[in-house]
Amino acid sequence: ELQKSNDEGIKEVLSMQKLEADNVFSRYVERNYTSWVQPDCDDKPTLSHTLIRDKVIPRIDDSDKPLFVILIDNLRYDQWKSIQTLLEPYFRTENDDIYYSILPTTTQYARNSIFAGLMPLEIRRRYPKYWVDEEDEGTKNQYEGELLGEQLRRFGKNIRYSYNKVLNLAAGKKLAEQMSDLMQNKLNVIVYNFVDMLSHARTEMEIIRELAADEQAYRSLMLSWFEHSSLFDIM
């Protein structure tokens, strides 16, 4: 709501509060991260490698209906709150929880950890054929579907599932056309990369920098994409 205000004083105060909150949170992570990643630590937030274990696995058997997991890469919490307003006529939010990414937060490490349910070093040790080192050529996340399958098997979930990655408009339209097939699966995971690509373009392309000159404009641009996206149609 504050983004609608034209009071520069309020905006400056909010900016200072956000900066201070960022600094406090950074110090909090620095103090606690090494203990969070220990296997025997019980007092920790949900992290990348425990996300599916904590939030998805318990729900697989909750219903006869298929479970859909939608991952929008690089989506910030404030962007999610913008999207949520469009979804409220169709969905009821039961829980609005936050999970923490492992470090580093780059896709190669954090997203592989989500689907494997393991820390990167453990992925490399257990599944070397599914791990691409940083210095190696090639896509670093090309085996997410296979890693998801391995994690499901470790939890004894021998179910029919699908993994779908949407990188462009054509892939999104194709996925929308396959919805009747997806409804036959117990679990469907859908990864959308647009927001991540937009984030990178914001730093690399001048025209995107102009369109997303500040946080309000950036949220507006992302919201416009979502409103006209195949993802919104699917949901």
Locate each region found by the language model.
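Feature captures the catalytic ectodomains and active-site-proximal regions of enzymes
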Residues: 1-235
